[in-house]
């Protein structure tokens, strides 16, 4: 049991694990609340505070509470169950062509239905492999070979880039006869992003197929152009699953060869999932409103909706409601505390705050400004309550894991504050080594691990040591964030981000630095592609959550800072996933 691995610090008291709804034993405990008072104003020197001028939230409490999907998850449950059985029969139909089955599986995944058919999909892929894999497919079909390669690799089967050699010439370039094969090129392009380190053929295919797709985009019919543009914007394996499902339902609806049963199930399932998301969001909106930080901390971002959107990217499936709620609390607190470090606190105050988090000691913040006390106590009470629930439900003592993650995050925030205050530009390597921690992906994933409820001794040890499964998604998170926010950060006086550090160290232009950052993002994704096939101590739900930590910033930072300064694109994404249901008129 992990509890034996750690020395329990003297800050640990009964209060840490007492639920607010359970009577407290009659012992002498310090009362912890968010009513801490700072010194009287005339005793505290006036400090000029910065302002980031973050725009207010557009998603008001009253608006969120007014959302109503009419309990779609209950209303359509029986109809969806019958459709699900029909689709299951299609997957398990051994008399149909294997390519048809693979295309069905691909459609199921893109429509956000894979979690309903996990065993059936595995059974179908096992059957495909036992039959000879790609050797039972049409050998001259680039689409068939590429699709099978992508699906098998994503599901952890051994496949090799040599499967594509029949389509390449002696120079390693695509044979001319395939260069006008739109479906084949699209499938090969998507498959190439599932490459592992050392797979040069696939690495080269990324660039080559992109050139062909750009050419095809200029000379193809309108219905094909939409699919090509979508793929070129971001490859499928890097997209948020539910956001892709929303887009693909509309695209699939336009296809002449669409399967009516599958399409109807996808629409019902989306609306049912959305109904659950709305209830989760309402719960979190009440929590955030009662916490009161948005009203008390005028300098900080009020981003409850954006934080909840994050959690949909992490785990959208209905069974992960508790996980979404927990992660909404975590990401909301990360946003607040990030602003304490970036905008509000003096360096001396931040040193004290960091020490308090590391010691997990409420007494350590008593001399800090009121808003910093509120921030710490909100963190302290929320995380202790989450730890209490985990101990109660799972019997797992997780305070050491959670507090270490928060302490390491605050240390990384503090390092960035030191660079900013001293106008220091660190080396690129030093920045990235600190930056993947300050991105907060590791904190989110440590909490997600326990919220998903699959614990093992070896995995717990890996959490403490920040296994690569936490590191590489966090690298993508950091670099995507920097690509979107570097200009605003420099305007606030922050000197260190990956772009400025790379420019300064290598004496290159901003354009060249951005190009290099994108290459590093690709490299990180190549590392992550190993998660599905490499032996790890983590279960598939957590592996998928880790990859999702990298998918989300690829979405929200694609065209700007959708977290700090949400724009119309951000609003449209929220609207399409959480607010606007899919019309069932055609169903």
UniProtKB/Swiss-Prot annotation:
The keyword Cytoplasm does not apply. Mg(2+) 3 binds at residue 489. Mg(2+) 1 binds at residues 338, 342. GO terms for biological process: diterpenoid biosynthetic process; hydrocarbon biosynthetic process. GO terms for molecular function: magnesium ion binding; terpene synthase activity. Gene3D superfamilies: Farnesyl Diphosphate Synthase, Terpene synthase, N-terminal domain. Its EC number is 4.2.3.-. A motif (DDXXD motif) lies at residues 338-342. It holds the Pfam family Terpene_synth. Binds 3 Mg(2+) ions per subunit. It is an enzyme of class 4 (lyase). Mg(2+) 2 binds at residues 338, 342. Its cofactor is Mg(2+). Probable sesquiterpene synthase. Does not produce any detectable product when tested in vitro. Belongs to the terpene synthase family. The Asp-Asp-Xaa-Xaa-Asp/Glu (DDXXD/E) motif is important for the catalytic activity, presumably through binding to Mg(2+). This is Probable terpene synthase 12.
């Amino acid at each position: 049991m992990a509890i034996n691995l750690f020395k329990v610090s003297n800050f640990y008291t009964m209060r840490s694990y007492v639920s607010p709804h359970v009577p407290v034993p009659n012992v002498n405990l310090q009362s912890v609340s968010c009513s801490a008072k700072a010194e009287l104003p005339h005793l505290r020197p006036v400090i000029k505070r910065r302002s980031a001028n973050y725009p207010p939230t557009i998603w008001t409490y009253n608006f969120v509470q007014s959302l109503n999907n009419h309990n779609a998850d209950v209303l359509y449950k029986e109809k969806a169950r019958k459709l699900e059985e029909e689709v299951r029969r299609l997957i398990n139909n051994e008399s149909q062509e294997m390519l048809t089955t693979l295309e069905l599986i691909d459609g199921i995944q893109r429509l956000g239905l894979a979690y309903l058919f996990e065993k059936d999909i595995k059974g179908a892929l096992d059957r495909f492999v036992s039959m000879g894999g790609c050797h039972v497919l049409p050998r001259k079909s680039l689409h068939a070979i590429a699709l099978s390669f992508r699906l098998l690799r994503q599901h952890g089967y051994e496949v090799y880039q040599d499967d594509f050699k029949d389509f390449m010439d002696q120079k390693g370039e695509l044979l001319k006869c395939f260069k006008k094969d739109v479906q084949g090129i699209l499938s090969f392009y998507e498959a190439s992003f599932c490459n592992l380190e050392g797979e040069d053929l696939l690495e080269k295919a990324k660039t080559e197929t992109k050139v062909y797709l750009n050419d095809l985009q200029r000379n193809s019919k309108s219905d094909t152009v939409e699919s090509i543009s979508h793929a070129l914007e971001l490859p499928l394996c890097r997209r948020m699953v539910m956001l892709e499902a929303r887009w693909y339902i509309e695209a699939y609806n336009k296809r002449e060869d669409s399967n009516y049963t599958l399409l109807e199930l996808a629409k019902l399932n989306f609306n049912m999932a959305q109904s659950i998301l709305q209830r989760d969001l309402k719960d979190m909106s009440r929590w955030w409103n009662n916490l009161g930080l948005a009203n008390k901390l005028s300098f900080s971002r009020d981003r409850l909706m954006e934080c909840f959107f994050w959690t949909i990217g992490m785990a959208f499936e209905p069974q992960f409601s508790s996980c979404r709620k927990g992660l909404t609390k975590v990401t909301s607190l990360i946003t607040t505390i990030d602003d304490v470090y970036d905008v509000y606190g003096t360096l001396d105050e931040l040193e004290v705050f960091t020490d308090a988090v590391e010691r997990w000691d409420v007494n350590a913040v008593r001399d800090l400004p009121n808003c910093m006390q509120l921030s710490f106590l909100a963190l302290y009470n929320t995380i202790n309550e989450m730890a209490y629930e985990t101990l109660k439900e799972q019997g797992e003592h997780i305070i050491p894991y959670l507090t270490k993650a928060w302490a390491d995050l605050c240390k990384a925030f503090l390092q960035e504050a030191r660079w900013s205050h001293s106008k220091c530009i660190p080396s690129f390597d030093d920045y990235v080594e600190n930056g993947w921690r300050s991105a907060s992906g590791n904190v989110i994933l440590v909490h997600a691990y326990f919220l998903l409820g699959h614990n093992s001794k070896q995995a717990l040890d890996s959490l403490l040591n920040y296994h690569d499964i936490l590191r590489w998604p966090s690298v993508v998170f950091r670099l995507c964030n920097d690509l979107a926010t570097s200009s605003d950060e420099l305007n606030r006086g922050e000197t260190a981000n990956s772009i400025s550090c790379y420019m300064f160290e290598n004496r290159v232009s901003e354009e060249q630095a951005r190009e290099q950052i994108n290459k590093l993002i690709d490299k990180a994704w190549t590392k992550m592609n190993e998660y599905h096939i490499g032996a790890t101590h983590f279960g598939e739900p957590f592996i998928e959550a880790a990859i999702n930590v990298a998918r989300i910033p690829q979405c929200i930072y694609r065209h700007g800072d959708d977290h700090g300064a949400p724009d119309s694109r951000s609003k449209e994404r929220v609207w399409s996933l959480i607010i606007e249901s899919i019309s069932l008129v055609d169903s």
